[in-house]
Curated annotation (Swiss-Prot):
Gene3D superfamilies: Ankyrin repeat-containing domain, Ribonuclease Inhibitor. Keywords: ANK repeat, Repeat. It comes from the Bacteria. PROSITE patterns: ANK_REP_REGION. SMART domains: LRR_RI. InterPro entries: Ankyrin_rpt, Ankyrin_rpt-contain_sf, LRR-containing_regulator, LRR_dom_sf. It holds the Pfam family Ank_2. Signal peptide: none annotated. ANK repeats lie at residues 149-180, 184-213. It comes from Rickettsia felis (strain ATCC VR-1525 / URRWXCal2) (Rickettsia azadi). This is Putative ankyrin repeat protein RF_0063.
Amino acid sequence: MKELIEFLEKTGLKTEADSLRNGGTELNPQSNIGTLGAKKLAAALKDNKSLKYLNLIGSYIGEEGARALAEALKDNESLKELYLTPADISTVTLNRIKEYIQRNTDLYYKEQQQYNKQLISSIKANEIKQAESIIPFIDPKYSNSVDENNNTALHYAVDKNLEKLSISLINKMSIETISIGNMYNNTALHYATDNGLEVISWFLINNMTQKALDMVNTDGNTALDYAIHNRHLL
């Protein structure tokens, strides 16, 4: 990694070099790093387990550089996205790279699914410290896991009046995930308004789709109905 950082600095890519030096997970050089740069990247990838995104569009690394990257990816399971300019790279080498990236993506998906499963289980079991320790490892792209009742971790956190944990999850999840309704068409907002949780309700309202805000559960109630019933002004 040290050689790669020095190479990036010498080629004028100081911002990218500083990012890697500080543990950055993405590399998007805006200039052509060529075959030499690709080889230094390959050497770094053999030891680096933090880089997840690499964009080399515009860099003409050729067959030699691509082969070096493919060889490095054989033992690297952390890089999930790699974009290349395919000029002068054989189909065989490109396919080899694609296979390794797909392998890494599949492994990462399984890992994220396991984290989400553990998170839901921890909240259901009231193991709050355990749940808090898992959240930093959750990737927002994969935060939409649900259990057999179509509940997300957020459903359980809100239903158990866990304000701090709920806000942490809201900040981590996408709008689409926050808006998920369970098997009874209850969103997290239904639970928040039914439990009189005004702070969480406001956080949710500002991070949900309109369709979710208007969702009617199997009892015929919207989240607003519960808010009115509990005399909470939203």
